[in-house]
């Protein structure tokens, strides 16, 4: 009988990536097949996020639902992973004794052994250690699930912003070797992936070992990824302004595979608040980065993160944030009301901004960002945009859907053979959360780089010398 696995994932793209790796790993080692129905599963895994308010209570609420399933099926294995697991550890079992496995983001590769241990003597397993790069060495080969894919290139963060739990839950920065990253992306490209999104809590801080033992920069890595045949788009998430160096900006100038869209969190437009947050940059320094980026890539669009109502934030501080939003003309944002994360320095600060004031500031900020986003969308009306077709539209199974370089969803009429390929679409309608268009050019008409194999290169360039010995000229 087929054994089934159910994974519930909360949080960032890194968590989504981790969950996909858990599924691949347990399929390879235990032949577990994913199911969307928790009641069908032999193993339930909750991959948690500690960023949002009341994250811990949300976890225990979900576990309470799963407890009922365990009462019906005592052999059911329940595991809790992710950042809340890393933060709470054994405390989770003190409140939910029926949980069998607690694992951190850096120990998910040990899940097969943990499951075997629980199956063997029914004793619970807690492993929230930080074994650095070992996680990536133990994961199975990647499996593409469409034309886009996430690839983790580093873990952790050394910045220790005063509001953030990431350094405590995912550890300090650890970069994967460049060869490992490039090999994973090449494997994905061979499976039809056209766009990769490089992931890291502080992705542009990547410093990886090259094949010759030297240390490569993030800019070096971007150029190497762009050289992989079949990869036509590169995104990366999430960046820190302090690591956004001029050599990265130069990649935007000369590497068309790098999309004209960047998510670069700033959090506040007030230098005083940025200092309290431990951000180590000013609003002016942030704007200088954007100015240089737009000089290198004039059509680039910028999104950001914002926290409103940080302890000590005055009306003047908030107005400086609003001015920064107008000056940069952000295209979109992820914006939140400050809520203290246990164990962070900000949790010890006096939370002196009234809740209603926080809500009002968030509303004002989001309305302004939405207005700017709609203005950006309207500028696209009548233009031709290159779309990577991801599949059928959520709005209608009779239409296809894909994304522009600047991350806009576009719905249009097309044929199934377009899925996984690029099409050029003329934008005909603009809506708050999507665009609509009509196909004006297919990939066959674009002259994009065709996939090459070593064998095809040799066959095409093979020559013979005077002795009849074959050789090829790269």
Swiss-Prot record:
GO molecular function terms noted in the UniProt entry: 4 iron, 4 sulfur cluster binding; metal ion binding; N6-isopentenyladenosine methylthiotransferase activity
Keyword NADP among UniProt keywords: no
Cofactor note (record): Binds 2 [4Fe-4S] clusters. One cluster is coordinated with 3 cysteines and an exchangeable S-adenosyl-L-methionine.
Domain MTTase N-terminal: 3-120
Residues reported in the UniProt entry to bind [4Fe-4S] cluster 2: 157, 161, 164
Cofactor: [4Fe-4S] cluster
UniProt-recorded name of the protein: tRNA-2-methylthio-N(6)-dimethylallyladenosine synthase
Gene that encodes the chain: miaB
């Amino acid at each position: 009988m087929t054994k089934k696995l159910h994974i519930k994932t909360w949080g960032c793209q890194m968590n989504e990536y981790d969950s996909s790796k858990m599924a691949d790993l347990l399929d390879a080692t235990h032949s577990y097949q994913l199911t969307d129905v928790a009641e069908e599963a032999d193993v339930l895994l909750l991959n948690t996020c500690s960023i949002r308010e009341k994250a811990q209570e949300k976890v225990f609420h979900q576990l309470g639902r799963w407890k009922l399933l365990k009462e019906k099926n005592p052999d059911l294995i329940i595991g809790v992973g992710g950042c809340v697991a890393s933060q709470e550890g054994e405390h989770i079992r003190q409140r939910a004794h029926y949980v069998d496995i607690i694992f951190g983001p850096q120990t998910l590769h040990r899940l097969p052994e943990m499951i075997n241990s629980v199956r063997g003597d029914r004793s619970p397993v807690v492993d929230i250690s930080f074994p650095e790069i070992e996680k990536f060495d133990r994961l199975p080969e990647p499996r593409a699930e469409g034309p886009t894919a996430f690839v983790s290139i580093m873990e952790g963060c050394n910045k220790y912003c005063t509001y953030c739990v990431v350094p405590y839950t995912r550890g300090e920065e650890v970069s994967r070797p460049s060869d490992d990253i490039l090999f994973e992306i090449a494997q994905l490209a061979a499976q039809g992936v056209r766009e990769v999104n490089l992931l890291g809590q502080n992705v542009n801080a990547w410093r990886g070992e090259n094949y010759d033992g030297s240390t490569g920069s993030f800019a070096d890595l971007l150029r190497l990824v762009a050289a992989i045949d079949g990869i036509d788009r590169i995104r990366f998430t999430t960046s820190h302004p302090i690591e956004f160096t001029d050599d990265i900006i130069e990649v935007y100038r000369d590497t068309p595979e790098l999309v004209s869209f960047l998510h670069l969190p700033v959090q506040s437009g007030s230098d005083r608040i940025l200092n309290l947050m431990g951000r180590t940059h000013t609003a002016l320094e942030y704007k200088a980065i954007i100015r240089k980026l737009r000089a290198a890539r004039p059509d680039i669009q910028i999104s950001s993160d914002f926290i409103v109502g940080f302890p000590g934030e005055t009306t003047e501080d908030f107005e400086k944030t609003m001015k920064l939003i107008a000056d940069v003309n952000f295209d979109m944002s992820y914006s939140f009301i400050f809520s203290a994360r246990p164990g962070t320095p900000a949790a010890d600060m006096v939370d002196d901004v009234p809740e209603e004031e926080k809500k009002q500031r968030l509303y004002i900020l989001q309305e302004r960002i939405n207005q700017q986003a709609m203005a950006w969308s309207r500028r696209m009306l009548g233009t031709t945009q290159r779309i990577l077709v991801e599949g059928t539209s959520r709005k209608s199974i009779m239409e296809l859907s894909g994304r522009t370089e600047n991350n806009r969803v576009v719905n249009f009429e097309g044929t199934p053979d377009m899925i996984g390929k690029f099409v050029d679409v003329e934008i005909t309608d603009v809506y708050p959360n999507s665009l609509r268009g009509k196909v004006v050019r297919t990939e066959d008409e674009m002259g994009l780089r065709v996939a090459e194999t070593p064998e095809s290169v040799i066959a095409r360039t093979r020559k013979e010398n005077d002795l009849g010995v074959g050789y090829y000229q790269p």
